[in-house]
């Protein structure tokens, strides 16, 4: 459907993307194993490449090539860099066409894989300065930043939060910036830990965190952990309410647990 209604040659956006259906992950939420998700991802990738004529890269646990395990590595260069990427032997797609033909010009590429549950989590800043958002992102993300030492050598300074990807984003419609994060393992770095660290770093730059948002769904346990951190032991409903309030999850759009918590959406509770 995305490939039918989105023409990538005319698409503009703030978030990195490589195609109309940018990424399609399979996650073992309930009654499924990671191996099963890997098999489904590879099977779908083959069909998308052969039947729809879209270049497909396999990532995460489904990656066949180790260098393609991490999504941002595949996205590097984004859609605009896809013509050159397809010419590079190291970046030939796992399935689908290897040339930037008219169909690929419209659809872009697709990244399909298997991974653990990822929380797309953005922290809102009361500044329009994207450089500040980028600096905070570099400090907190796992990969950190590359700096030049006194010898003129490039050295990587590791970030503060494990299993976290982050970048600064400017929201034109809101006139604010965000530290846009992917929490790759919320059991190691849950939302409230990322929120508090972003708040701490923001204060060093003279700006404030005003709230946050969850893009897509979130596991119930992540909210319960936040609720316990801020409010102690309460009922499930009260813990989730405390998490929503203290994380400012309704600042941009009202956070409705029944529509945002994956267990509630799937009827698992």
Name the predicted role of every residue range.
Residues 1-269:
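Long, contiguous binding/interaction regions
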């Amino acid at each position: 459907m995305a490939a039918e209604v989105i023409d990538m040659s005319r698409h503009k956006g703030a978030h990195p993307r490589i195609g109309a259906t940018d990424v399609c992950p399979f996650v073992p939420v309930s009654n499924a194993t990671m191996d099963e998700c890997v098999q489904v991802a590879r099977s779908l990738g083959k069909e998308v490449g052969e039947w729809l004529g879209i270049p497909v890269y396999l990532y995460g646990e489904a990656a066949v090539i180790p260098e393609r395990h991490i999504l941002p590595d595949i996205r590097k260069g984004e859609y605009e860099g896809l013509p050159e990427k397809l010419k590079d032997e190291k970046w030939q797609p796992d399935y689908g066409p290897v040339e930037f033909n008219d169909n690929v010009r419209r659809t872009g590429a697709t990244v399909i894989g298997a991974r653990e549950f990822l929380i797309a989590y953005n922290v809102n800043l009361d500044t329009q300065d994207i450089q500040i958002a980028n600096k905070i992102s570099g400090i907190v993300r796992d990969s950190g930043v590359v700096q030049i030492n006194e010898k003129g050598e490039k050295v990587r300074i590791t970030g503060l939060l494990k299993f976290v990807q982050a970048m600064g984003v400017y929201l034109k419609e809101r006139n604010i910036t965000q530290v846009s994060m992917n929490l790759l393992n919320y059991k190691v770095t849950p939302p409230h830990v990322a929120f508090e660290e972003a708040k701490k770093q923001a204060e060093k730059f003279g700006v404030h965190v005003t709230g946050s948002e969850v893009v897509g769904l979130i596991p119930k346990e992540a909210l319960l952990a936040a609720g316990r951190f801020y409010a102690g032991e309460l009922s499930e409903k009260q813990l989730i309410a405390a998490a929503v309030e203290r994380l400012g999850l309704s600042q941009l759009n009202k956070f409705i647990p029944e529509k945002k918590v994956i267990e509630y959406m799937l009827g698992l509770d």
